[in-house]
């Protein structure tokens, strides 16, 4: 029997060999291309992802680094399984600096030679994987591939990219555990992993790394936030739509550079830190759609810079402190779907507020008396019972030594809790006031982050209303990946998010000024709208976001409207920026797709998301207490104008000098409150971090699935003609090292790759 099997295998080998020879161009010997093709197919199934590239001796290269770049890019080209827009069709020959999406600049250690400093293939709809050979691009400063269909994992040899400043892998189909190789990149400042399928825990080392922006929302991460969370120097961090649980870390109050933070739609279950008021520079604070309990700390009234405050869809109780509603910059306060029993009259005079579904006497649309009675009859929450980290000094009571045996020992002294002094860090530079026009949070059902599938190119402003993806499927993605236009053509890349379909209006846009604007162009919305989640506490099943219209699989990203997107919404495949020339300035417009595909990024996109369809509020639950976390959070549109100064000028194109970006301008997370209320936030141009929602997971080669239908995306239609965030070269507050890296700074561009601003 064994011999028979061996004979069959031998004949099978001969048949395959015959077929291979039959396709040979010369009839007898396989061409180099055919050999590489066979190798690539084998590598997809076996061994590590690496390809042997043979360099034609007749090719001449300016220097060895460009030769290495040729090898890396040819290996990558072979790892591409689908390139419907022919972005890599001109990746031929030795002049790698003329390849579409590849940008060269003088080397940092030798200005006389050119080297590949940036790669920008945003919104190219390419399917494939990242080969290990990419580690040969030793001078690479920025790597932007958002809104494609890349799958697999991040190559281990990325650890050789010692100059990499911006890494944007958002809105793809990467999977597996957190890519720890990014922790080995010494120059990395901007990390965007949004809208992928990463899972498991996030290494605590991430929060000790010197980063300025962390976007890991819309994945499948599940873990408790570590005690060193507060050690992170970031100005913007978005963890929304994952499966984090446990405490809100008490160390959170130590994040002195923090401008925007979004915990929305996770499973956090604790009280808010009592000294949360130490966050003096925060402009956007969103902890909606969790399971937080206890009162709203009085110290929230000390967060003097906050513009967008969202604590909706939790189980908070007590009275709203009047000091919170008197904050000087507060524009949108959403505290619906809790169990608050009192609010100061001043709260009713805020520009935008939502107090529905509480237990407030005399106010409309409150919970039923039965629900309120059932909840309030329970024992009050003891916030000290949560072990939430290092805020409490010695937990155990201090026991004084017992006196002599004859005397009874005195009772041990009560434990002493040292409360850290509140920091009064000066408020962040006054960024333009973000425009918060989030509609009031819809009924319990979390607002759907349904990135509207904008079918046509940039027609309507993209509406990014990502549905909360609490359910099994990956969270609907508002895609925040700012894809730079990457069509083969040389024209400068337009990072304008594709126009979202008019139907689903984005949730309220919070445009906090301070946060840095990461304008990663949002992936083009795909036609399919995201479903509206109007469900009660249980988060609606995440609908896989519709694939962005353009290749980007995910549907439109939310509007994290970072700096106003350049007017040009990248047409489905806007041509990539000219080869070496620096790309146009991209305000870190993350996803906000400019309304019209205008190649010039500066124009502010007009976001007039159609009013979200009325979200059908599920009838108030019976008297039973709604302890279950409220429905998935509504899409939060923090359209905070990009913080003026954040300039990570590491645009993909020409040499970008990565001077450590000044503290990014305020990122605008437009996390819409429940759809019903449309908050037209103030002047600041909304920053749309519209990273397209990640396309539903599909085979690598599969095009992104259409986005789910968006139900009631609350964002009120607004045309935000917010000029791109001032790209003022401010010294970045965070002392980021000046990156005089391969790419010269792109004027007016914050983070070169329009990383979707922090949002979902």
Swiss-Prot record:
InterPro entries listed in its UniProt record: Leu-rich_rpt, LRR_dom_sf, LRR_extensin-like_regulator, LRR_N_plant-typ
GO MF assignments: peptide binding; structural constituent of cell wall
PTM characteristics: Hydroxylated on proline residues in the S-P-P-P-P repeat.
Tissues where this protein is expressed: Expressed in roots, stems, leaves and flowers, mostly in vascular tissues.
Contains the Ser-Pro(4) repeats: annotated span: 409-758
Organism field: Arabidopsis thaliana
GO CC, one annotated term: plasmodesma
Chain spans, region Disordered: 389-502, 515-610, 663-748
Residues in LRR repeats: 21-45, 113-137, 138-160, 161-185, 186-209, 211-232, 234-255, 256-279, 281-303, 304-327
Gene this chain is encoded by: LRX3
Biased composition (Pro residues): 394-415, 423-502, 663-745
Localization (cell): Secreted, Cell wall
Signal peptide range: 1-20
Protein name as it appears in the record: Leucine-rich repeat extensin-like protein 3
GO BP: cell wall organization
PANTHER family the UniProt entry points to: LEUCINE-RICH REPEAT EXTENSIN-LIKE PROTEIN 3-RELATED (PTHR32093:SF120)
Quaternary data: Interacts with SH3P1.
Glycosylation (residues): 16, 86, 98, 281, 332
Disulfide bond positions: none
Job description of the protein: Modulates cell morphogenesis by regulating cell wall formation and assembly, and/or growth polarization.
Keywords, ordered alphabetically: Cell wall, Cell wall biogenesis/degradation, Glycoprotein, Hydroxylation, Leucine-rich repeat, Repeat, Secreted, Signal
């Amino acid at each position: 029997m064994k011999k028979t099997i061996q004979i069959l295998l031998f004949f099978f080998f001969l048949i395959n060999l015959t077929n291979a020879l039959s396709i040979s161009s010369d009839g007898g010997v396989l061409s180099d291309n055919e050999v590489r093709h066979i190798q690539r197919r084998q590598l997809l199934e076996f061994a590590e992802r690496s390809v042997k590239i043979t360099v034609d001796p007749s090719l001449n290269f300016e220097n060895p680094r460009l030769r290495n770049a040729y090898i890396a890019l040819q290996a990558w080209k072979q790892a591409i399984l689908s390139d419907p827009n022919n972005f890599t069709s001109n990746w031929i020959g030795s002049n790698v600096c003329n390849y579409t999406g590849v940008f060269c600049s003088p080397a940092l250690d030798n200005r006389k030679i050119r080297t590949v400093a940036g790669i920008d293939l945003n919104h190219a709809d390419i399917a494939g994987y990242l080969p290990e050979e990419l580690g040969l691009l030793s001078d690479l400063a920025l790597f932007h591939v958002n809104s494609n269909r890349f799958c697999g994992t991040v190559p281990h040899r990325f650890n050789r990219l010692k100059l990499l400043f911006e890494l944007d892998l958002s809105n793809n189909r990467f999977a597996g555990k957190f890519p720890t190789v990014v922790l080995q990149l010494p120059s990395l400042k901007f990390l965007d992993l949004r809208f992928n399928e990463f899972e498991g825990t996030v290494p605590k080392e991430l929060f000790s790394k010197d980063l300025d922006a962390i976007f890991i929302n819309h994945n499948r991460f599940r873990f408790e936030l570590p005690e060193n969370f507060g050690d992170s120097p970031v100005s913007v961090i978005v963890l929304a739509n994952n499966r984090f649980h446990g405490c809100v870390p008490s160390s959170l109050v130590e994040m002195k550079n923090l401008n925007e933070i979004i915990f929305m739609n996770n499973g956090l279950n604790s009280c808010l830190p009592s000294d949360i008021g130490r966050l003096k520079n925060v402009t956007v604070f969103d902890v909606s759609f969790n399971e937080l309990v206890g009162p709203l700390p009085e110290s929230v009234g000390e967060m003097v810079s906050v513009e967008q405050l969202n604590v909706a869809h939790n189980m908070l109780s007590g009275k709203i402190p009047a000091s919170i509603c008197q904050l000087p910059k507060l524009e949108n306060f959403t505290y619906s779907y809790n169990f608050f029993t009192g609010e100061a009259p001043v709260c009713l005079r805020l520009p935008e507020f939502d107090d529905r579904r509480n237990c407030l006497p005399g106010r409309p649309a409150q919970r039923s008396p039965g629900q309120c009675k059932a909840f309030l009859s329970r024992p009050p929450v003891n916030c000290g019972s949560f072990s939430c980290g290092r805020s409490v000094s010695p937990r155990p009571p201090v026991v004084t030594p017992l006196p002599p045996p004859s005397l009874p020992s005195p009772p041990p002294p009560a434990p002493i809790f040292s409360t850290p002094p509140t920091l009064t860090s000066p408020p962040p530079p006054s960024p333009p006031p973000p425009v918060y026009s989030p509609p009031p949070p819809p009924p319990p059902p979390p607002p759907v982050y349904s990135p509207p599938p904008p079918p046509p190119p940039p027609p309507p402003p993209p509406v990014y209303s990502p549905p909360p993806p609490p359910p099994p499927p990956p969270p609907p993605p508002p895609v925040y990946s700012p894809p730079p236009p990457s069509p083969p053509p040389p024209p400068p890349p337009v990072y304008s998010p594709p126009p979202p379909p008019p139907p689903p209006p984005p949730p309220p846009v919070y445009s906090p000024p301070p946060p840095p604007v990461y304008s990663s162009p949002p992936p083009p919305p795909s036609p399919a709208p995201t479903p509206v989640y109007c469900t009660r506490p249980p988060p609606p099943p995440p609908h896989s976001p519709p694939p962005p219209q353009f290749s980007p699989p995910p549907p439109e990203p939310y509007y994290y409207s970072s700096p106003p997107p350049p007017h040009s919404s990248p047409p489905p495949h806007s041509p990539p920026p000219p080869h070496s020339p620096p790309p146009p300035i991209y305000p870190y417009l993350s996803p906000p797709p400019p309304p019209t595909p205008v190649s010039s990024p500066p124009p502010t996109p007009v976001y007039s998301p159609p009013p979200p369809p009325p979200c059908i509020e599920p009838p108030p639950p019976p008297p039973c207490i709604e302890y279950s976390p409220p429905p998935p959070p509504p899409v939060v549109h923090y359209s905070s104008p990009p913080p003026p100064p954040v300039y990570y000028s590491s645009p993909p194109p020409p040499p970008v000098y990565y001077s450590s970006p000044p503290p990014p301008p305020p990122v605008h997370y437009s996390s819409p409150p429940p759809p019903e209320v449309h908050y037209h936030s103030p002047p600041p141009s909304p920053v749309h971090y519209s990273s397209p929602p990640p396309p539903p997971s599909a085979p690598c080669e599969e095009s992104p699935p259409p986005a789910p239908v968006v139900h009631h995306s609350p964002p009120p239609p607004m045309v935000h003609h917010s000029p791109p965030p001032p790209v003022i070269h401010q010294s970045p507050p965070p002392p980021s090292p000046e990156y005089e890296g391969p790419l010269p700074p792109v004027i007016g561009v914050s983070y070169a790759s329009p990383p979707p601003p922090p949002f979902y």
